[in-house]
UniProtKB/Swiss-Prot annotation:
Superkingdom in the source lineage: Bacteria
Source species taxonomy: Bacteria, Pseudomonadati, Pseudomonadota, Alphaproteobacteria, Sphingomonadales
Subunit structure: Part of the 30S ribosomal subunit.
Protein name (record): Small ribosomal subunit protein uS17
Pfam families: Ribosomal_S17 (PF00366)
Length: 100
């Protein structure tokens, strides 16, 4: 059976060699037909601690690494949100009176 691959956002990188990845999916409600979002968090192995908060990453199912870790980060899809925060700070400093 092929390995499952999911794409999600890193929500925590505080633990050593582990990141928490939030994976969202959209499902149709069985009775009402409305499209609703469902999410699940996975602990994924990050050997070199190279992925940070806000990164969109691809994770791949592996053999169990620990009690809760059965996924490993394969690669980065989109860089994280720290660059956007720094850009907002630059704009706030450039405008007189802050970011109004």
């Amino acid at each position: 059976m092929p390995k499952r691959i999911l794409i999600g956002t890193v929500t925590s990188d505080k633990t050593d060699k582990t990141v928490t990845v939030l994976v969202e999916r959209k499902v149709k409600h069985p009775l009402y037909g409305k499209i609703i979002r469902r999410s699940k968090k996975y602990h994924a192995h990050d050997e070199k601690n190279e992925y940070t908060l806000g990164d969109v990453v691809r994770i791949e199912e592996t053999k169990p690494i620990s009690k809760t870790k059965t996924w490993a980060v394969k690669d980065r899809v989109v860089a994280g949100g720290t660059q956007a925060i720094e850009a907002d700070l630059d704009v706030a400093e450039a405008t007189p009176g802050g970011a109004e």
